[in-house]
């Protein structure tokens, strides 16, 4: 384990303290930052793109755009996604660059029926790619309510060109203990997928606008 729950709780308490986290006029996200050493990103020594369901649901759910198959529309509505588009509505977006960029900017996840994946790649792909976002295929099952709900509380662990990851773990109105559980879920995924304990440099937590706080590493 890269860090203990106790050390995460203590760091989160400091990060959420008003001295380090002045009151804003919006609910801030809380982020976990993990940095690595001795890794050559150009050689592809660390590649992560993992979807992690958070055990403690954030008060501010992730925003999900869903393009279901016809038989999935009613179950998709039950999950109350941020945006629900039919295949026909997606086709009508062709060439509407401003609307497409807005959808790409305002949503975190893009869940798409498999028969619409190619269309999404053509229409939304140019706006998603530069933002590090991507479509995820929906299962073929008629009932996709729970699948969508899982993404509303999921976060993305993704490396880019630098040896670190910065991951959403919740919101500032959550208990430090709950945020710590979410952080542990992310850290466990990193540890299991990348085997990087020997290359760990540091772990930090912070709110959107707050000061960064270092987490004591497990010895």
UniProtKB/Swiss-Prot annotation:
Record's protein name: Large ribosomal subunit protein uL1
Assembly information from the UniProt record: Part of the 50S ribosomal subunit.
InterPro entries: Ribosomal_uL1 (IPR002143), Ribosomal_uL1-like (IPR023674), Ribosomal_uL1/biogenesis (IPR028364), Ribosomal_uL1_3-a/b-sand (IPR016095), Ribosomal_uL1_arc (IPR023669), Ribosomal_uL1_CS (IPR023673)
The protein's role, per its UniProt record: Binds directly to 23S rRNA. Probably involved in E site tRNA release.
Similarity field: Belongs to the universal ribosomal protein uL1 family.
Stored PROSITE patterns: RIBOSOMAL_L1
GO biological process, one term: regulation of translation
UniProt keyword annotations, A-Z: Repressor, Ribonucleoprotein, Ribosomal protein, RNA-binding, rRNA-binding, Translation regulation, tRNA-binding
